[in-house]
Amino acid sequence: TPDWAADTLPCIPSAYSGASPVLKLTRGKDGKTTPAELWFHRRLRVHHGNAVRIGDHVYGSSGDFGPSFVAAADVKTGQILWQDRSFSKANFILADGRLIILDEDGNLALATAGPSGLKVISKAAVLEKTAWTAPTLVGTKLFIRDRRSIMALDLG
């Protein structure tokens, strides 16, 4: 899922033999939009579908087939700001300025992220392994699932 912002710099999360490029979109006088790759970094291979953009930084779970980690990159330069190995491959959603993280091992966490690092507020094992689906937040209800079950948690 691409991450968009008003500065026309979408991040396109991908893995395997690729990486997660950031594109620069330019509108010509003819009204046509032209994409150009701004940067491409092999250390940001977002394996599970999504990344989150907060300001000028993009946060994603990299790992492809190797060791996994949460990483932060400067969206304008591609510089990797930090890596955190406390999660297996994970999906994220942004809620009220905080990240809700669900990793593939079933660990659910609430965290804050910034250019200097990831701060985990709380973390708990709530599902079995193979939790690949991104969490969904509807109001105060958080829906999460692994390959065998689905769970609704009231965060209100």
Residue ranges and their predicted role:
Residues T1-G156:
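Noncatalytic, solvent-exposed loop/strand surfaces
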